[in-house]
């Protein structure tokens, strides 16, 4: 049996205290413009076809599926800051639509499941959540901090920059992103799984005293204690809504082989699931992102393994339990 296969005995609906009912909106985000490798835009359809809607209906949710095929369409020409960052107008156009879609579904009291796509999409998901829940905290699960500014980014790929927009570090804003704004403070952000940082990211994390738990901390304290520390830091007393943003490259390449920026020494499958279980048990989840699945960066079995991991992240975050 696949380690990600759902069992009929593992049903549990986990409602958020911030929602009125059992609605879940899956927003497919077929987009790979924030980085140079084709394939991430294929992930939402593959995750859907693998059975994500059935998974969540099986848990007892009222599921709404939102397709966004237009996200694959690039603008006819790029913006004025193409030399500063790659595909700025394309990323801006899509993430602005993402913001609006996330906000719209949350306003209807539905938990939002965002399936990417590359992690630049979080420029929109974070701002969309904050538009409805302006005290929401962000638990960022990733091998990378994604906190570079366009100026500090060595690669100029915007999937490494989303949090610099959310935190206001990208100011003065490039013309293409004039619509963005600082929406979170450092005290409402925590990282788990970090193991590959650029110099400026390391400086930001240290100087701004951001809660950043690397794989060293996971090894030293265990995932249970790390999650406890992270959640207590960003959400003391469980009073705030939680936005879980999960880049599958946080997991070890054995667990998530089909992704674009693999780094050895990542989370095990069980460690990843424990994070999701803890968020579900808190009763505070309002949105979950699953990003950077790239089916083209592996053989058929590796693509399936990574797609099934994405499904497991969503199911477990929304309450699937063993007992």
Curated annotation (Swiss-Prot):
GO terms for molecular function: arginase activity; manganese ion binding. InterPro entries: Arginase (IPR014033), Ureohydrolase (IPR006035), Ureohydrolase_dom_sf (IPR023696), Ureohydrolase_Mn_BS (IPR020855). One of its GO terms (biological process) is arginine catabolic process to proline via ornithine. PROSITE patterns: ARGINASE_1, ARGINASE_2. It catalyses: L-arginine + H2O = urea + L-ornithine. Mn(2+) 2 binds at residues 142, 144, 247, 249. GO terms for cellular component: cytoplasm; cytosol; nucleus. Pathway: Nitrogen metabolism; urea cycle; L-ornithine and urea from L-arginine: step 1/1. Substrate binds at residues 144-148, 155-157, 198, 261, 292. Mn(2+) 1 binds at residues 119, 142, 146, 247. Binds 2 manganese ions per subunit. Pfam families: Arginase. Keywords: Arginine metabolism, Hydrolase, Manganese, Metal-binding, Urea cycle. Its cofactor is Mn(2+). Its EC number is 3.5.3.1. It comes from the Eukaryota. Belongs to the arginase family. Homotrimer. This is Arginase. It comes from Schizosaccharomyces pombe (strain 972 / ATCC 24843) (Fission yeast).
């Amino acid at each position: 049996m696949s380690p990600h296969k759902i069992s009929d005995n593992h049903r549990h609906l986990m409602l958020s205290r911030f929602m009125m009912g059992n609605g879940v909106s899956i927003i497919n985000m077929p987009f790979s413009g924030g980085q140079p490798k084709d394939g991430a835009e294929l992930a939402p359809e593959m995750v859907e076809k693998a059975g994500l809607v059935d998974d969540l209906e099986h848990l007892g949710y009222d599921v709404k599926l939102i397709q966004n095929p237009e996200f694959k369409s690039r603008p006819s020409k790029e913006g004025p800051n193409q030399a500063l960052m790659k595909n700025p107008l394309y990323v801006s156009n899509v993430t602005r639509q993402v913001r609006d879609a996330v906000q719209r579904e949350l306003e209807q009291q539905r938990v939002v499941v965002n399936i990417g796509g590359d992690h630049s999409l979080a420029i929109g998901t974070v701002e969309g959540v904050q538009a409805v829940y302006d005290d929401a905290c962000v638990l960022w699960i990733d091998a990378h901090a994604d906190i570079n500014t366009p100026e500090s980014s060595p690669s100029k790929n915007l999937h490494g920059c989303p949090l610099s927009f959310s935190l206001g570090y990208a100011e003065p804003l490039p013309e293409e992103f004039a619509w963005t704004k600082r929406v979170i403070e450092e005290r409402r952000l925590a990282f788990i799984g970090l193991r590959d940082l650029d110099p400026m990211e390391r400086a930001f994390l240290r100087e701004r005293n951001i809660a950043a738990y690397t794989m060293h901390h996971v090894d030293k304290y265990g995932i249970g204690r790390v999650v406890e520390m992270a959640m207590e830091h960003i959400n003391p007393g469980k009073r705030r809504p939680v936005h879980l943003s999960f880049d599958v490259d946080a997991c070890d390449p054995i667990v998530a082989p089909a992704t674009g920026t693999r780094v050895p020494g990542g989370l095990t499958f069980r460690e990843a699931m424990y994070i999701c279980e803890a968020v579900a048990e808190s009763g505070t989840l309002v949105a979950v992102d699953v990003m950077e699945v790239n089916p083209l960066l592996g053989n058929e079995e590796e693509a399936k393994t990574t797609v099934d991991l994405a499904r497991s992240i969503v199911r477990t975050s929304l309450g699937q339990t063993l007992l």
